[in-house]
Amino acid sequence: MILKSFLLGNLVSLCMKIINSVVVVGLYYGFLTTFSIGPSYLFLLRAHIMEEGEEGTEKKVSATTGFITGQLIMFISIYYAPLHLALGRPHTITVLALPYLLFHFFCNTHKHFFDYGSTNRNSMRNLSIQCVFLNNLIFQLFNHFILPSSMLARLVNIFMFQCNNKIIFVTSSFVGWIIGHIILMKSIGLLVVWIRKNRSIRKYIRSNKSFVSELANSMSIAGILNILLFVTCVYYLGRMPLPIINKKLNNLEKMDQAKLKNNTPLSYIYKNQEDLYLEILGKKDKEKSFSLFEKPILTFFFDYNRWNRPLRYIRKINKNLSVRKETSQYFFYTCQSDGKKRISFTYPPSLSTFGEMIARRISLSTLEKLSADALYTEWLYTNKEKNNNLNNEFINRIEALETVFLSINILDTKTRLCNVETEKKKNCLVNKKNYLVKMDDPFLTGMYRGRINKLFSSSIINQISIENYEKTYELNKIHYNLLPYPNSREYEHKIDPNSPDYEQKIEKLEKIQAQIDLNNRFIFLWTTIIAKLKGQKNSSRINEIGKKPPRWSYKLINELHQNYKKRRKEQGIIQGLRHQLRTRKYKHIYFLNRSTRTLETLKQSNLNNSNMDKKFNNKDLGFISYLEEPDFRRSLIKGSMRAQRRKLVIWGPYQGNPHSPLFLEKKQDFPFPISDLIKLFLNIKDRLGKKSEFEILNKQSPPKRNNQEDVMEFWETIPHGHKTRGILLLAQSTFRKYIKLPLLIIAKNIVRILLRQSPEWDEDFQDWNREIYLKCSSNGLQFSKTKFPKNWLRGGFQIKILYPFHLKPWHRSKLRLYDSDRDLKQQEDFDSCFLTVLGMETEHPFGPPRKTPSFFEPIFKDIDYKVEIRKLNFRVRRIFKKIKKKEAKAFFFIKQKIKELLKGNKIPLFLPREIYESSETQTEKDSIISNQIIHESLSQIRSTGWTNYSQAEEEMKHRIDRRKTIRNEIEIMKKNKINNAESSQKILKILKIKNIELLVKFFIEKIYIEIFLCIINMRRIPLQLFIQSTKKIIDNDKYINNNETNQERINKTKQNKIDFILSMTIKRAFDNLRNSKRKSDIFFDLSYLSQKYVFFKLSQTQIINFNKLRSILQYNGPSFCLKTEIKDFFGRQGIFHSELRHNKLPNYGMNPWKNWLRGHYQYDLSQITSSRLIPQKWRNRINQCQTSQNKDLNKWYSSEKDQLLDSKKKQNSKVYLLPNKEDNLKKNYRYDLLSYKYIHSETKKNYYIYRSSLETNNNQENSTRNKEKFFSILKNIPSKNYLGKSDIIYMEKNKDRKFLYKINKNIKVEPNKDQIKDKNKDQKKDKIHNNGLFYLPIDSNLEINYKKVFFDWMGMNEKILILNCLISNPKVFFFPKFVRLYHKYKEKPWFIPSKLLLFNLNITSNFSENQNINGKQEEYFLKQEEYFLKQEEDFLKQEEDFLKQEEDFLKQEEDFLKQEEDFFKFRPSNSKQYFELNNQNNIEEYFLESTEKLKIFLKGDFPLQLRWAGRVNQLNQKIMNNIQIYGLLLSLINVRKITISYIQRKEMDLGIMSRNLNLTQLMKTGILILEPARLSLKNDGQFFMYQIISISLVHKSKYQSNQRYQKQENVAKNIDKKNSDLLVPEKILSSRRRRELRILISFNLNLKNNTGVDRNTLVYNENKIKKMESIFG
């Protein structure tokens, strides 16, 4: 048994019981209610954040208790009905809570109201605590605003219907809410702590530090909370409509006087009907006046029937009001269903209220409820009885069918409606029945089925009544519906037929029934008679109970209905109604304007018509057109909340069209339409692809939309579109009429006068006066000249021009016949038009502009006409000449013929000629024409007497035959021509198709060529192309610089051919690239400067050997090989002079770069740098990712022979390496070593990778230096752009680099050396050699007196010690030899690369060249270690002294706090009295000193930030907070109010403010650290290149000497003269690209001549060449 209890099923059931228990469910719902946060949390958080001390803890406790009690009241209100009604009734919370909230907000904004600062405890303590308690208690009763529907809070109320143990449920839900509240508060605290500790979030907070500090100082936390409270007030007012200030909706339609007169009953008591009408109106007014006061006060202020939600209003045509759809159609009540008690949601509410009323009056004994089992058994019993009855009836019918006699009850019969007609058939009357269709028969269809009372005989009635009365019947229908379980057998009664009183009871019932029938008949007759007499309907005696649908108390109308009722003013409706529904934007379009003139003419014509006034009212007939645009306000009711509107959701920041949330997924949110791209692709495919010979259009093209509609919609969619269009039309009309046309007339007539023609002033101005401007509606309906149409600014209007004026070149007095018809047609076409906004003419309103008759067209036509006449005259003359020639020939021919005829027989001249010819000639002609003629004999033809007749007949036959033959031949020719034409057409089609294919191929090839050309000219050209193109140019062109500046060039003896074509193509590519960059914005990032471009520019400007181009460039005539643009380009760049005066190459060390700088003068603008500030972190991030760092900077200037083998130094640099891949680094170095040994195997010299040495003259001139030109002053270069204060900051920088400038006892921080000034300008300067771009000369002389120097600039002083440098930074303690370099880097970080701190440095010394500098450095650092150990002991002593000073500070703070309290207690209102009470002189002196210090402090530039040193652990954070507050107070104007607020909130501590402590003391003690403000400038690649080259050319810096440096002149004189590094293309490339460059160069080395250059014997020196190395070696 014990094991059975531990079965799985029992455990599951136990768990389910626990989960479904009241306690667990209450805990669950209570826990959920914590997430429905209300405004009370603001007060709770305010108390927990702001309050401190004892009073703060009390306020926290009061806030939490008030918060908990408020929530407890809310839970109790669920169980306790009065509280629930008080808190849940509509508008009670808004009436009570909102005024309190607003009062609290406006009162709490005052700074001294319920102040949470330092106040007297006895005065305000109790009241403030009570106010905190009340705030948290009252605001807990408000609605929740984070979850607007408050669903989580309402779940508790919903569960109360199902819960029986209500008290347990309330307590458990309250406990669950407390648990959730505790978890929520703890999670908020942990979140705040996590934000403070997390650095990734703190950096975002620090980035907005200035904004946060300004916000904190401008307003307190209490002010922020007050703003949040005000937002909640607005939120509450926004979510619910204002209960008092609402729109009064008018629902009464007042009838007009005429209607009331017609509807009043006629009576002869009053002589005048108007008196009766006035009396009726007076009664109605009285009723209205009293009805206002009869309304209750709540309904007067709060109208619950008005429209709060923006629901759709469905207007009824009839007079009934619209049905309210927002009321619930469901009413929940218990009823019996299937033998069990269930909740019905369609129970009639009236029946439930009636049942409750009866249940109160009926005794409790009758209302006893049966158990569920008894009720179910009763239901089963009744169902069995019904089943048995049906079975018995069915069996009885089956048995009756077996019998012979048919009874009535065997089958179910149905009656049908029919029409009986009698017909005579064979002397017999036959009844014919015509039945209705089943669909139309009311007896068969369900809805229209009626009941027919069957008339039976008395015997049948008695028999049926007896049978019915024997059956069961119910006592009362009310018991069935309302009393419990009326179907039970207790309420059933039967009459026993065997009882002795059976017959008596039936007789009584029959008598009662007969009396009832008589009474019913009498009542029916009486009611019908009275109804007929009174004209009323028959009132049925059965009152049907029906449910009236809930209707709105207002009848709302829209704007259209309002305008319609305004127009029906004469028909009985008054104009006072206003619309409440917003309709879609529309406008009236009129197509018939019935003016007063037309009405008068119609009335005169129809004098007999008396109804003319009614038929033809002075109205404009038209229709309404809606605009095709989205409308958010459509069908909205005024006063409803748009934010709660359904089906239209605003889901984006800007939404032009209303969208339903159901269709958001189908909406395409792509930035470009895909359909347009598909269409474009298909069009290109159709153009390029093959087309069929005959294109068949299967698809019908969609009809094009009218342009007028588009223009109309355009002006309607624009805000105030019609207004602007109307003003423009008026302006164009006045401009056209009075300015444009008169000027044209004047200009035309002046030209005619100049051409000596008569002017046409009168004719032109007559045409100008004919032009008339009419104002029309938007659709072109005419109005008049002066009057505008109604609402012409909103709906728009048109200007119609009648007889528009067109300038003509001349006016004809009499028109010709052919010109008159043409001019009449033109006048009909241009009789009227409409004016456009641009001053043009259109035929239709909003139509396209039409062509106007041109002024010059008739002139050109006249000229063409005259030219054609002249041509005709010329042609006619030629024709007449030809005719004359032919006539002369013909006349001569006729003469000859006449002579011939006169010589022969005399034949009549006018007879036919062929008759008298011989037969032989005739047969010859006939044989020529055809062979089908039948030849007759001469005997037959020459019959006597008929000779003339026979010859004529024969001639006719002959002609007929010839015509036939000619026709046959013509038909044959036509057939041949048709065949030839078809074949030629086929050939032409084939040729066309082939031509199209060839054109398409040519077009595609052209596109491919352009694409490949674009790809070739892209910016990302491979680097090998540049290396190969410049390899032959760079090959063996090496220069040797002498100490003199005007050094001659060393020419080569053996010149190689230049690949000039390749270099020109590269040059063009880069010209295109440079032009594209010039067109774009000049301010771009340094990271976009490619190495390829820099390499090309350097190789182009320096290393080209111009001896190869001497013959081309030196030729002054027209060159066939080289363009003049290339010569000009070389001349502008300063690389090669166009005249070639110097036969030698320019100096490699100095002149080429100066000339290049002169050519790039466009970067010589210092104003550009001011406009390139961009965010600092972004710049650092991009530059950090894109800058390439050199691996082997530790190998600079070392005297080792083979620096590549130093593997220890290689391991220090791990650039471009991924983790766990150090083997790649070793492989790269081995490959470098192998390649360099192979390249320089024959030269046997120690070629260094990153060094190109050149000897230069170290002597430089002495000159004064101006401010802010430390890097830009070059010799013989007019440079205005310089690296000033703004440029030094970003010279060297990493992502998280911080420049910490410490102001210590013996160290000076200088942001720029330009601040050094010297009065003696002619003194000698200290020589500093710029051996490289970032070369750092370090003086190794250690015997300098540093005690007298306060600011040690780059002095490397041994005795200078930084406080706490060993303890605060343990890395420095273990590596003391780097301390000196580390602090020197902090002094001047913008000039020294960060990697030079850990690598070998070039230390100038007095030793000889052969001594090892690294060995001296090691000895020096060993001495430094000993020295630091001694200084450590001194530092510990100084630290003890500092702790003592700190204790003194704390004592001073306590004293100052006491003085502060006395100051605020006894401070008088007037400041002058205060000065009189104390020592006036001392205070005035103190304030004067402080003001002077402030002025001096504000005048200076402080691009630095203050910080405490990390070693001061005992100082409180309040010191730093005070310093921040002081800095903010300095920048404010009204300092007094803000300082008082800081002191009241205890954010400013007055004890720390001591008068004796100065900034200089803090600097001497080393407490403060200065951090510079970081700026960021954006420069392009050319600008950086310009600056770098300008720096590298400064051989000797023109510094002015300090006294300390004047003592070291002897040391400076002995400084070694060393070769300076020149910036060559090799250094700009990356390490891998350098390797490729050197390998390619090595293949073209001339090993026989190691120097690779032609030597000039005048300059050549072998001793010097031994010290040289190749430029790229």
UniProtKB/Swiss-Prot annotation:
It is a multi-pass membrane protein. It comes from Lactuca sativa (Garden lettuce). One of its GO terms (cellular component) is chloroplast inner membrane. It comes from the Eukaryota. GO terms for biological process: protein transport. Part of the Tic complex. The chain crosses the membrane at residues 18-38, 67-87, 90-110, 127-147, 175-195, 218-238. Its main location: plastid. This is Protein TIC 214. It is found in: Plastid, Chloroplast inner membrane. Keywords: Chloroplast, Membrane, Plastid, Plastid inner membrane, Protein transport, Transmembrane, Transmembrane helix, Transport. Coiled coil: none annotated. Belongs to the TIC214 family. Involved in protein precursor import into chloroplasts. May be part of an intermediate translocation complex acting as a protein-conducting channel at the inner envelope.
